């Protein structure tokens, strides 16, 4: 019988956020797989957890992933932890979880600390709908292309960012997304936690005057304007064309007018096709 893979979240800055259940599971499993064993051993020692520890990270995930799967298939129970927060979110834990599912291995995800949701809730921006993007690319051109794809995203957007790229990322956001509201979360739950709720331009000015330290979660307001209408509707019927324009924020009257002008049709020809809209 196969063992079970436990996904165990760890504190993102404050050790008091470690749950009783996580401590119990870590004490019960046969093996703990950690992103950085040097970092995790300190956490385990603090909670007096003395279980075998092995590394599982981006640079060894292929070979170590196979090793862990074989251990699980042999009946061992394994706990997966990351340096901070929920494994599988912007880290290689995603891969071992997929492999476990492919091998029909039971997986149990324990609830706990997650930087993205913690930052979102305290942002003051819309929380009903959001998009998690994680880290943007290091390359400036690729990063801007990624932001271009999100330019008209109406949901609140969550990003992770490192201190040495923060200023460049904020400048790219201002250029591509425009000067919208943002909540910049630094060192969440730690001693020097800071949340700046301003517009992007103001935040850039703030960090131009201070040293950038710590890890950041950026919560960016979703797009509030009218979406850009693409001119690639040749294959649509007049009715489909009108519906598409309306879905992009145009009212019915203007949509009909646009279709008539684009297709050189009389108004009544198009109007008859959309009477029920």
Which ranges hold each PLM region?
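Conserved helicase motor
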Residues: 56-62, 136-139
């Amino acid at each position: 019988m196969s063992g079970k893979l436990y996904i165990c979240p760890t504190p993102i800055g404050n050790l008091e956020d470690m749950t009783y259940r996580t401590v119990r599971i870590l004490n019960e499993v046969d093996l703990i797989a950690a992103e950085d064993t040097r970092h995790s051993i300190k956490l385990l020692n603090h909670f007096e957890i003395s279980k075998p520890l092995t590394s599982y990270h981006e640079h060894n995930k292929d070979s170590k992933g196979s090793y862990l799967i074989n251990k699980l298939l042999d009946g061992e129970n394994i706990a997966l932890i990351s340096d901070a927060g929920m494994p599988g979110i912007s880290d290689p834990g995603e891969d071992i979880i997929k492999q476990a599912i492919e091998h029909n291995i039971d997986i149990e995800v324990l609830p706990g600390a997650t930087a993205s949701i913690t930052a979102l809730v305290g942002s003051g921006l819309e929380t009903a709908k959001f998009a998690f993007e994680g880290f943007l690319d290091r390359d400036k051109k690729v990063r801007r292309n990624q932001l271009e794809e999100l330019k008209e995203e109406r949901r609140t957007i969550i990003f992770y960012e490192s201190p040495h790229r923060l200023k460049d990322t904020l400048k790219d956001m201002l250029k591509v997304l425009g000067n919208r509201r943002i909540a910049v979360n630094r060192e969440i739950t730690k001693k020097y936690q800071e949340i700046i709720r301003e517009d992007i331009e103001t935040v850039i000015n703030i960090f131009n005057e201070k040293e950038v330290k710590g890890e950041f979660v950026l919560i960016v307001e979703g797009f509030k304007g009218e979406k850009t209408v693409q001119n690639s509707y040749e294959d649509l019927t007049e009715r489909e064309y009108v519906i598409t324009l309306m879905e992009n924020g145009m009212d019915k009257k203007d949509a009909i007018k646009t279709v008539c002008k684009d297709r050189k049709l009389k108004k009544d020809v198009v109007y008859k096709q959309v009477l029920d809209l």
